[in-house]
Design a protein with these regions (language model features):
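SF2 helicase/translocase NTPase motor core
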Residues: 1-138
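Short aromatic/hydrophobic "clamp" motif used to bind/position activated sugar donors
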Residues: 141
């Protein structure tokens, strides 16, 4: 089990203690936003969480879970790309629509949107998939970004 730096403990406490449902943790790159989120999960004793992130970050999440979680945690990590979205044929005017996979359309104790700046365009299909179809049913939504817009 790795130990957090003092500044990371402050961020983790802020995530865990905040009363707001939506939070943005916007530390600079490399300061350990993943570790802070996992420490907050420990404090809140969350047993299951959904992470939506770039494909390259998925393996990092699984590695960090091993290092930082103290409670049993089922972490579901999906990339912004096709691993969490399905393409469905629509009308002749529009060749396809993008929706989250059906298994993601359920209540979640926690949704973490890692590198949330990738969802800055509210009209993009992946932003709409996350913010309209998944986030409304999550008890908590934590957006993590080292590049806030």
């Amino acid at each position: 089990m790795n130990e957090l730096f003092p500044y990371q403990k402050i961020g983790a406490e802020w995530l865990a203690d905040a009363k707001d449902r939506w939070l943005l943790l916007a530390d600079e790159p490399g300061l350990g936003k993943t570790a802070q989120a996992l420490e907050a999960i420990n404090k809140l004793r969350i047993r299951e969480a959904l992470v939506v992130c770039p494909a390259i970050a998925r393996l990092n999440w699984f590695g960090e879970v091993e290092k930082f979680t103290k409670v049993p945690l089922r972490l579901h990590a999906y990339s912004f790309n096709t691993t969490f979205m399905e393409r469905e044929t629509a009308t002749a005017k529009k060749s396809h629509t993008v929706r989250p996979k059906k298994e993601l359309l359920r209540p979640w104790p926690l949704l973490i949107v890692d590198e949330s700046h990738y969802l800055a365009n509210p009209s993009s299909q992946r932003s709409r998939a996350v913010y309209l179809h998944i986030a409304p049913y999550a008890e908590r939504v934590w957006c993590l970004s080292g590049t806030p817009a």
